[in-house]
Amino acid sequence: MSVARNLWRVADAPHIVPADSVERQTAERLINACPAGLFSLTPEGNLRIDYRSCLECGTCRLLCDESTLQQWRYPPSGFGITYRFG
C-alpha cells in the first residue's frame, strides 16, 4: 500500500498528548515502533508527538500504559486519515 494515496485532514487540536514526564525507555519504544514516525525526543529529553501524520493504528496505545499518554482519542469526525487503496 502506498501511503502517498492516503489523505489527511488535520484537526486544529492534537488527538494524542504525551504525559509531562515519560520514562526514556518507554519513549524509545514508541519512537522505534510507530509506523508513521510521530514520536521523537526534544533536546531536553521530553517526548514530542507530531500528530498530523498519525495513521490511527493504535500501536502507541498498545506499547505504553495510561500514564505515558495523557490523551489518546480518534480525531473529530471528518478529520484524520482517509485510507485510499489502489
Curated annotation (Swiss-Prot):
Organism of derivation: Escherichia coli (strain K12)
Functional note: Could be a 3Fe-4S cluster-containing protein. Probably participates in a redox process with YgcN, YgcQ and YgcR.
Species classification: Bacteria, Pseudomonadati, Pseudomonadota, Gammaproteobacteria, Enterobacterales
InterPro entries, per database record: 4Fe4S_Fe-S-bd, Fd_FixX
GO biological process: DNA-mediated transformation
Protein family according to the UniProt entry: Belongs to the bacterial-type ferredoxin family. FixX subfamily.
Span of domain 4Fe-4S ferredoxin-type: 45-74
Keywords for this protein: Electron transport, Iron, Iron-sulfur, Metal-binding, Transport
Disulfide bonds: none
SUPFAM superfamilies referenced in this protein's UniProt entry, alphabetically: 4Fe-4S ferredoxins
Protein name: Ferredoxin-like protein YgcO
GO molecular function annotations of the record: iron ion binding; iron-sulfur cluster binding
Keyword Nucleotide-binding: no
Gene field: ygcO
